[in-house]
Amino acid sequence: MEIVIAFIAVLFVAIILIPFADVKWKGIITITAVSLNTLLSCIVAIRALAGISVVEILPGSLVTGLIAVRVDALSAWFILIINFTIITGAFYGYNYLKAYRSQSANLSLHGIAYVLVHAALISICALQNSLAFLIAWEIMALASFILIIFEHYRQDTLKAGVNFLIQSHVCILFLMLGFMWVALKMNSYDFSAITAFSIQQPMLINFTLLLVFLIAFFIKAGFVPFHTWIPYAHPAAPAHVSGVMSGVIIKIGIYGILRMLLLIRNDFISIGYVILIFSVVSGVYGVMLATIQHNLKKLLAYHSIENIGIIGIGIGLGCIGLGTGNLVLSTLGFAGALLHTLNHSLFKSVLFYAAGNVYQATHTMNIEHLGGLIKKMPKTAFIFLISALAICGLPPFNGFISEFLIYSGMLAGFKGAEITLVWILVFSLFGLVLIGGLAILCFTKAFGTVFLGHSRHPQHTSPAEAGPGALIPMYAGLSLIIGIGIFPTYFIAAIMQPLTLFINKLGPGIPDQAILTFNALNRIGPCAMGIAVFAAVIFFIRKKATQKKPKSINTTWGCAYIAPTSKMQYTASSYVRTYRKLAEPMLNIAVKKEDIKDIFPLRGKHETHPHDKAETWFIDIPLRQLQFFINRFSFLQNGYLQVYIIYGVVFVTMVLLLPVIYDRIIALIQFFNQL
């Protein structure tokens, strides 16, 4: 109880101090507040991961009833992920926002929102009362909206924020529907009532209830086709907010899915198929669109959708394993999902911070205008490269570890599987392989175009490397990216407690085949270190051998062409042209070009602009139809005050009469039933 009180006290003190502090101190107060609350919540989380769950009962009110605060191993795992990303984001943001210190009021609002987002995320993981959960979820949505619209004077930023806010409240509507459904039947808002409700109901009702919650959490996590807010919100927000949104805010949707799987008794095979299919589609579609983006942050945003798909594949496999009694499939699926949740929060937040460095140095996110930054920003380029290798799932970095577990789970699922499951697994395996291949294509494009070659567009100022304030949080994330890849044993041990919550449904203990898979990962570290030492020795020998010999630096051979320009380099579009031509039937790509007609043309033009086909189908077209329908009632808005007063009178009359009419109808039905 003392920790809960201290947590709330830190939150309120920060909210009071930030508006009145000097502009230089606002960021320091924000960092201090999130650091203190990180320390408090980590104490509880570490105890829970050690097997000591924490339960506190808060008094609540007449409406909410008693409010249970329960931190089990699943909550603890997500709390630790949230805390690390929030801390690195706070330190990076302090440096990033120095350029905006003339906007004191804006910085105050931003600092308050950042502290609130952190508190709301921790509360969502800890609260086990549906009304309190919804309040925390709403605080998270509103505070995230404020963080996104930091540059509210830009029309595209404001539009992205409003889009996020609308879709967040659609998510909340589905959450309310699910929670109210249970509360009306069980007369309780405690999460234990959800389990009690599912025990009493047939599987069809439970499946429907879980689907309602899944839609809500799919929207927050960004599964296709509920992903359409992500490509707008991530590029619009400041870099540290983009890192936090991709690293942990969308992961709260993953937490919700896992929590409901624990609470609701269900047909795990059916729900596993649903999650798996949505996840494969999300992963493939996300990386397909990421590969053809021109905006660096939008490219990273679509990769968030791709990685949410990878996490979902692990969850889907785990559910199918529970349903079929395949303990190995279940163990490796859930283990891969839990570990990839951490891994993605690390490399994606670091990538967004690197994108922030690029933006502050060049004032553009257009990949087609960039190039040659490795000469000006070598540290940022190195960090981006390592993070890109990690997100592509290459050893010896963290992305490889979690994806290896998911691949191993798929292969284990074929043993003794019926024909339907075999086809589903083949489909999933093909999808995961395609995701990995396209991710490599995408990030070779991104790194090569942004950091190699020469600048493709004149810069108003010479780009410079970011300072230590920006680089230190990135190095912190990078250390874990490398650490998990080389020493996976310690991090696999950390997920054992949350993993046990799921696999205990089949029986106690980790199966031997899964243990062998975990042990196989231990060989990666020594192999990687051996390769690194060998490469260092070769580099040292080469350097010593050439140290005393004369050196000359010349331009790359240009096939005897003596007047090269930066326009002759590969662009981001031309690099992926072959892929783009193959994928055009599945993607919505607008092409603008000016045909060359003269023998000696002065100029030519060819542009490609990718659009989200899923957004067109599932958002734009339905909204146009809804707008057409609503416009049929535009005559109601006629501008006459007298008519508006009549509307009010009619509405109040209906509110007063409906209960009476309802009671009479019920009485009439009961009368006829008696006959």
Listing of model-derived features with the role each one plays in the protein:
Residues 46-56, 180-191, 317-323, 396-412, ...:
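Membrane-helix interface motif
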Residues 69-83, 203-217, 420-436, 511-535:
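Hydrophobic alpha-helical transmembrane segments
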Residues 24-35, 160-169, 297, 301, ...:
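Alpha-helical transmembrane segments and their helix-start/interface "positive-inside/aromatic belt" motifs
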Residues 490-529, 541-675:
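Aromatic-capped, Gly/Pro-kinked transmembrane alpha-helices
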Residues 5-23, 215, 222, 283:
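N-terminal signal-anchor/start-transfer transmembrane helix
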Residues 88-101, 108, 112-133, 143-465:
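Hydrophobic transmembrane alpha-helices and their helix-loop junctions in integral membrane proteins
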Residues 32-45, 169-179, 384-396, 473-494, ...:
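Hydrophobic alpha-helical membrane-insertion segments
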Residues 2-3, 13-112, 188-198, 497, ...:
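Transmembrane helix-loop-helix hairpins at membrane boundaries of multipass inner-membrane proteins
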